[in-house]
Regions:
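Conserved non-catalytic scaffold segment of RNase H-like nuclease domains
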Residues: 3, 8-133
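Structural signal for conserved beta-strand scaffold positions within catalytic alpha/beta enzyme cores
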Residues: 61-64, 153-159
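Short, polar/flexible loop-turn hinges at active-site or ligand-entry regions and domain interfaces
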Residues: 88-95, 142-148, 203-208
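Short alpha-helix plus adjacent loop in nuclease-associated cores
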Residues: 155-182
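Acidic, Mg2+-coordinating catalytic module of metal-dependent nucleases/exonucleases
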Residues: 119-126, 130-131, 176-240
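Hydrophobic residues within well-ordered, non-membrane alpha-helices that form the packing/core
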Residues: 112, 132, 136, 161, ...
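Substrate-recognition/cap helix-loop segment adjacent to the acidic, metal-dependent catalytic center
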Residues: 127-155
């Protein structure tokens, strides 16, 4: 366990626990002006056990060694390759740890069992779900195809936020004021984690770190805000 990150809190069986997760990837390609991420390889996984009020019970920041160390050329394609020196410094000081992808998976699944996790949550969860599956299939030569076991409930805070915030007048005004509208024929408020967190903190200058655990921390606050709204909303990744 990464002692710089974790002071494990006692498990309370009356509490419902969730696993928040975020990934950063290499092998993203720009095709026709759009980022193609279907072959993305995960090099950074941040995850935390949280409750609906944002209390953090355990958290990890992990560099996936097969990609970060074993695919040096590929890492140059990472969307945020300029952060690579930062990763090396944090690995040296212990604020991040190296693991193989299968070690990451075993750790996550053991935490999910230990805390009886209700759901795995990510912002734009389809991307993280897909990237973890793609990477696992690559490093195991398809011996293991799915990162999360069949039946794992996946929630998407982007979908939740769309139902909670997209039509909220104060959110729409905030996005219009600061230029956070989509480029659709009829512009709509953006629902990126960065913009949502700017709204929640009333800080339009906030810049998302785009590193796994740091993004988990802001996405946890988006989850908390959605739950606190007590509004009917879609949660599951595959829910229409």
């Amino acid at each position: 366990m990464n002692k710089k990150l974790n002071k494990k809190m006692k498990i309370d069986r009356r509490v419902t626990y969730y696993l928040m997760i975020d990934t950063e990837t290499a092998n993203t390609q720009l095709i026709d002006g759009k980022l193609w991420m279907n072959d993305a390889q995960v090099y950074d996984v941040g995850f935390a056990i949280v409750d609906r009020y944002g209390r953090v019970y355990v958290r990890f920041s992990v560099v996936v060694t097969e990609v970060f160390d074993g695919m040096a050329d590929l890492m140059e394609s990472a969307y945020y390759a300029n952060k690579i020196p930062q990763y090396h410094a944090q690995l040296a000081n212990g604020s991040r740890v190296r693991m193989t992808l299968m070690q990451v998976r075993r750790l996550i699944l053991s935490l999910m069992e230990e805390y009886n996790v209700r759901a795995v949550i990510a912002h734009n969860a389809r991307f993280d779900w897909n990237a973890l599956n793609v990477t696992q299939r690559y490093v195991t030569k398809s011996q293991y195809r799915h990162f999360f076991p069949y039946g794992t409930e996946i929630w998407d805070t982007m979908k939740m936020a769309k139902d909670v915030f997209a039509d909220r007048p104060t959110y729409k005004r905030f996005c219009e004021k600061h230029g956070y509208m989509t480029k659709h024929k009829t512009p709509r408020p953006q629902l990126t984690a960065e913009v949502l967190y700017r709204y929640l903190t009333n800080n339009p200058e906030f810049v998302e770190a785009h590193t796994g655990l740091e993004d988990v921390e802001i996405e946890t606050q988006i989850f908390v805000a959605c739950m606190a709204a007590h509004k009917k909303m879609r949660r599951k990744l595959w829910e229409d």
